[in-house]
Amino acid sequence: MDIINIPTYLTLLRVVMVPFFTVMFYLPVRWAPMICTIMFFVAAVTDWFDGFLARRWKQTTSFGKFLDPVADKVMIVAALVLIAEHFHTWWVTLPASIIIIREVIILALREWVAAIGSRNGIGVLWISKIKTFVQMLALTALLWSSDEWIVIIGIVALYVSVLLTFWSMCLYLYIVRYDLFNY
């Protein structure tokens, strides 16, 4: 099976779109937030679509399984940095920081578990899929921030995603607890 297939191209597209929605975010034109949000939303949809196609067409690859969560993290962290800078307040920067810290910890944990050859591999948990969906919902709303209600929905979703972020991190740590304390 080829390493690079249509689902993998969609995942790569998600990574490639990050600098484009970042540049769009800073353009000094009235319609820039809407275009930035549309670009982010399209990238977010590819997250669902690439996995769906890979399973449906039986084109799952080890590279795709590795790249998909990395692409998610790159996209989410970039958007978190943008909204933290845009709102420039602790009540946005704090949850953004918590989410970024968790993502780095889990990526490092996955690398460590793979490096020690543990049988307790860290697959994607159902709670992580929900977390990613809520994060993308929050970030879509906050990048757009067209009116007060959209911002409120985005902030609420951001805080819900922080709770899901912490919960999923605890589950991952529980899965590898024996490796953490016995290695």
Curated annotation (Swiss-Prot):
Lineage, opening ranks: Bacteria, Pseudomonadati, Pseudomonadota, Gammaproteobacteria, Enterobacterales
Cytoplasmic topology ranges: 1-13, 83-87, 170-182
GO cellular component: plasma membrane
Natural source organism: Blochmanniella pennsylvanica (strain BPEN)
Alphabetized Gene3D superfamilies for the sequence: 1.20.120.1760
Keywords: Cell inner membrane, Cell membrane, Lipid biosynthesis, Lipid metabolism, Membrane, Phospholipid biosynthesis, Phospholipid metabolism, Transferase, Transmembrane, Transmembrane helix
Role summary: Catalyzes the conversion of cytidine diphosphate diacylglycerol (CDP-DG) and glycerol 3-phosphate into phosphatidylglycerol. Essential for the synthesis of anionic phospholipids, thereby playing a role in balancing the ratio of zwitterionic and anionic phospholipids, which is thought to be important for normal membrane function.
Membrane topology: Multi-pass membrane protein
E.C. designation(s): 2.7.8.5
Name assigned to this protein: CDP-diacylglycerol--glycerol-3-phosphate 3-phosphatidyltransferase
InterPro entries recorded: CDP-alcohol_PTase-I (IPR050324), CDP-OH_P_trans (IPR000462), CDP-OH_PTrfase_TM_dom (IPR043130), CDP_ALCOHOL_P_TRANSF_CS (IPR048254), PGP_synthase_bac (IPR023762), Phosphatidylglycerol_P_synth (IPR004570)
